[in-house]
């Protein structure tokens, strides 16, 4: 079903190969407005190719019924807005009747820049996108409609061209992460594996600290400890027998109290990495803890309520107060869309494109190579000063309470154990996000997509590492499926 140049040219090539091709077009070849597309369409009509112009719904159903594959080449990357006839009839018909649909560049009806579907859209089994993936295929409705993505190389020197062109983001392939799967050396001890302090929890949310701490340990940290309000410290101790818990003075509501800042900061100096935020609330004491940790000379991850504390401190947006978070040591912020919107004082963040833009405001304001914002969403973006990376996206089952606490713990364990990766922070964090995604796939397989809860992910971090390592080796052609090596 074509009204674009690529669709018509594809029909010519397929007919040369003996493939029985029917073309569905809204107009006669001579009526196509674009000169090059009109020329190709005329060539197509001159071949032994059946062209059906403006079929009714019933006529289209007959054509689809006899087709093994329907190629969707209706709209290109410039489409936006609402569908008009006949496409508002054809697209639902294809979705209802076709067994296999392959879309060219983007599924017709999808906005290639935002990933938004306003009316209806082709649901493709595969999308062959030309030259480079489009951001809309990863944003908003894009993943639901695009199916499996294949990038078509239209130019022999494409890599050289792409390197010279500004691009929104880079896709992280499994093989890019292969260096992170090296086995532990035999002479290692728990401290040289990296130590993590989890500053988290409250009487209302003790589970967040528990999940983050267990995840950091599963991700490889040799020594993990928790600093939590004394109102919930004993509960956390009972849940984590292998992890020390520091009881920090709390306020009347069971959150960090006024004396917490000095105590937490003194403890934090001894650790390879500090994770602050899960379940800690935004009490006055919690806000002081966040401010104090930002001043310390230690790698820091700010998650959940730590980010909400930042947003409350800088009511006009943290990008207007970069001195507050500009530091020498690594700083990672892990906001989801709503948290990110609060960090930039209410800028609308509702899809991948707006999330990247908001994250870049924060990063560029500080201008530090050590600051990375991980904008969490259906497709998570790792945003640094010079590059934006898109690691493997997880299943929908990861959209569950506590999943972010698990990811924060994985990030902390990863940062603590691999601090020598200072020249490529974004890729290191992509590895951590990918592990979280692999754990999500493993949990969905084990428990069913709708039944996954956050604690299911933690014990699957180890198997997730094995899956990720296998995919990395296969992506590089080092190990074939079924190999014993």
Specify the residue positions occupied by each region the protein language model found:
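Internal gly/pro-rich beta-alpha loop/helix module
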Residues: 68-69, 74-167
């Amino acid at each position: 079903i074509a009204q674009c140049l690529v669709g018509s040219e594809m029909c010519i090539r397929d007919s040369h190969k003996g493939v029985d091709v029917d073309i569905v077009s809204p107009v006669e070849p001579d009526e196509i407005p674009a000169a090059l597309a009109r020329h190709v369409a005329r060539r197509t009509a001159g071949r032994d190719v059946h062209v059906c112009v403006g079929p009714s719904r019933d006529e289209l159903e007959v054509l689809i019924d006899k087709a093994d594959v329907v190629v969707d080449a209706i709209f290109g990357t410039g489409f936006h807005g609402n569908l008009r006839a006949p496409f508002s009839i054809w697209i639902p018909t294809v979705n209802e009747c076709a067994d296999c649909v392959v879309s060219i560049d983007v599924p017709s009806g999808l906005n290639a820049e935002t990933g938004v579907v306003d009316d209806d859209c082709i649901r493709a089994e595969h999308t062959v996108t030309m030259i480079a993936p489009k951001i809309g295929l990863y944003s908003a409705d894009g993943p639901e409609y695009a199916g499996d993505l294949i990038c078509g190389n239209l130019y022999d020197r494409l890599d050289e061209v792409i390197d010279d062109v500004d691009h929104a983001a880079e896709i992280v392939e499994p093989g890019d992460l292969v260096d992170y799967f090296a086995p532990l050396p035999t002479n290692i001890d728990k401290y040289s594996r990296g130590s993590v302090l989890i500053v988290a929890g409250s009487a209302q949310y003790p589970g967040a600290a528990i999940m983050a701490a267990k995840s950091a340990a599963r991700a490889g940290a040799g020594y993990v400890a928790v600093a939590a309000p004394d109102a919930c410290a004993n509960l956390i101790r009972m849940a984590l027998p292998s992890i020390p818990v520091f009881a920090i003075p709390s306020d009347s509501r069971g959150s960090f109290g006024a004396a917490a800042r000095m105590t937490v900061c003194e403890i934090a100096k001894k650790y390879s990495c500090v994770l602050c935020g899960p379940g800690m609330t935004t009490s006055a004491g919690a806000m002081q803890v966040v401010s104090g940790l930002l001043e310390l000379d230690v790698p820091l991850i700010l998650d959940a309520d730590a980010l909400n504390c930042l947003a409350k401190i800088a009511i006009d947006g943290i990008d207007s107060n970069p001195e507050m978070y500009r530091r020498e040591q690594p700083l990672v912020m892990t906001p989801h869309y709503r948290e990110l919107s609060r960090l930039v004082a209410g800028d609308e963040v509702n899809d991948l494109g707006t999330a990247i833009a908001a994250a870049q405001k924060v990063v560029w304001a500080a201008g530090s190579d050590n600051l990375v914002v991980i904008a969490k969403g259906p497709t998570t973006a790792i945003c640094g000063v010079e590059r934006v990376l898109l690691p493997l996206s997880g299943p929908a089952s990861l959209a569950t309470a506590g999943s972010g606490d698990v990811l924060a713990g994985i990030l902390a364990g990863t940062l603590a154990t691999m601090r020598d990766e200072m020249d490529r922070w974004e890729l290191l964090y992509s590895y951590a996000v990918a592990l979280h995604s692999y754990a999500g796939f493993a949990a969905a397989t084990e428990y069913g997509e709708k039944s996954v809860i956050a604690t299911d992910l933690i014990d699957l971090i180890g198997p997730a590492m094995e899956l990720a390592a296998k995919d990395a080796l296969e992506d590089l052609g080092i190990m074939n499926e079924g190999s014993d090596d």
